[in-house]
């Protein structure tokens, strides 16, 4: 039998396990959906829409809830002659300034590319460079006024713009400041909890009229979400009973993200399917889930290490040594002391402490280390620990630094590894 054939022993419809699959109902978000619907209700009354700010980690249903509710809102609006609702949707990935957001909004209006966007224009798209910000904002306001009625501007992943938040202040105020007839409301969606805290006070006053937190899913909620998908995705009796609970538990302990849980279940199914093609076994087991978790974490470390210098690898190796001895989370000062010994043992010269701190921050941003805020009688300080399994980190490091059996033996002695 060739490598490519349609024979499947376990997976009936893999697309059901993908992020972009849309179930008939959004599970485990009834409270948030009710709160969100209340915030959007002025639109149906023909009133000025609220500005709504959604926040929560990635994969907890913010964008899916927005799509579901706005599609329902658009259908309801069609029943009323005095409600003319249009939606403009923009994913702000790659937009690091208010200027870029404004240009992309203009071009979304003139050449819509997102599912929710309902407007179109015969005007030519604008170049992303070469204009003053005021000119771009005026072009945007003119386009919005030409659309008229009620306009909801959805800015997904708005935290990408960082501190350059002019657009979030100006856009909600455009109607009152420029005497526009169009009723404009902004829906901002952020994956970064700190983004809201760092907004300027004037932006908070305008954008955050209605705030809705989407908390991480707990293990029971993730189990229900996964089971709903699994019932469709797999053949009968293709999953052992502890597979879905284990996927949910792993993901709940980490991020509480349904996206992460689905990825884990999908990977476990792939591993089991590959085995089934050779030995005929036709079930996903807890061992497949554990192997999938290990492979995903290892790949996460490998991808993060692509941006690391050799010194960055030594910093990670240092934290691995400490983790093997159950000495983490550990303070930056003590990590640096151990790092100096690690570097000398590899025949190199250590960096200054400031640069090592930068490497620790980079590893934290890549999800390889976790920053732990701690305090004592002398004030606050930072501690770091692994945010992936020690085994995954060592596997990835060995591909760059060679055999690390001594650390594995230490970890076994301390019962960190089996």
How would you describe each model-predicted region?
Residues 47-70:
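Walker A/P-loop nucleotide-binding motif
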Residues 234-237, 246-311, 326-328, 346-352, ...:
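C-terminal helical "lid" subdomain and adjoining coupling/linker elements of P-loop NTPases
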Residues 312-320, 336, 357:
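Hydrophobic residues on short alpha-helical segments
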Residues 329-418:
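Terminal-proximal interaction/regulatory segments of ATP-powered molecular machines
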Residues 1-50:
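A short, basic N-terminal segment
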Residues 70, 168, 357-361:
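Short, hydrophobic-biased segments on the C-terminal half of alpha helices
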């Amino acid at each position: 039998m060739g490598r490519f054939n349609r024979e499947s022993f376990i997976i009936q419809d893999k697309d059901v396990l993908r992020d972009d699959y849309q179930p008939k109902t959004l599970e485990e978000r009834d409270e948030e959906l009710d709160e969100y619907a209340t915030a959007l209700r002025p639109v149906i009354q023909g009133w000025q829409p609220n500005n709504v700010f959604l926040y929560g980690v990635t994969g907890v249903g913010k964008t899916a809830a927005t799509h579901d509710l706005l599609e329902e809102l658009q259908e309801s609006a069609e029943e009323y002659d005095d409600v003319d609702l249009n939606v403009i949707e923009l994913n702000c990935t790659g937009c690091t300034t208010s200027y870029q957001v404004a240009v992309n909004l203009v071009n979304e209006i003139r050449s819509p590319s997102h599912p929710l966007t309902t407007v179109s224009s015969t005007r030519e798209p604008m170049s992303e460079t070469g204009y003053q910000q005021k000119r771009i904002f005026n072009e945007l306001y003119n386009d919005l006024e030409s659309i008229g009625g009620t306009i909801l501007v959805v800015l997904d992943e708005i935290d990408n713009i960082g501190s350059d938040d002019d657009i979030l202040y100006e856009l909600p105020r455009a109607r009152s400041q420029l005497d526009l007839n169009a009723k404009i409301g902004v829906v901002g969606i952020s994956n970064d909890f700190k983004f809201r805290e760092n907004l300027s006070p004037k932006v908070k006053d305008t954008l955050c009229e209605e705030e809705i937190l989407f908390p991480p899913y707990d293990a029971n909620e993730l189990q229900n979400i996964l089971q709903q998908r699994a019932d469709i995705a797999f053949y009968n009796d293709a999953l052992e009973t502890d597979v879905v609970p284990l996927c949910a538990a792993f993901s709940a302990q980490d991020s509480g993200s349904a996206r992460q849980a689905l990825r884990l279940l999908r990977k476990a199914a792939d591993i089991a399917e590959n085995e089934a093609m050779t030995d005929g076994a036709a079930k996903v087991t807890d061992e497949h889930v554990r192997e999938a978790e290990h492979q995903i974490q290892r790949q996460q470390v490998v991808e993060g290490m692509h941006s690391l210098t050799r010194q960055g690898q030594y910093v990670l190796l240092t934290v691995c040594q400490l983790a093997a001895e159950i000495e983490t989370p550990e303070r930056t000062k003590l990590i640096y002391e151990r790092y100096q010994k690690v570097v000398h043992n590899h025949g190199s010269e250590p960096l200054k402490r400031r640069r090592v701190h930068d490497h620790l921050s980079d590893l934290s941003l890549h999800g390889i280390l976790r920053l732990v805020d701690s305090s004592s009688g002398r004030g606050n300080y930072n501690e770091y620990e692994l945010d992936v399994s020690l085994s995954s980190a060592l596997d990835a490091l060995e591909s760059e630094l060679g055999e690390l059996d001594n650390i594995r033996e230490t970890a076994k002695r301390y019962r960190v590894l089996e």
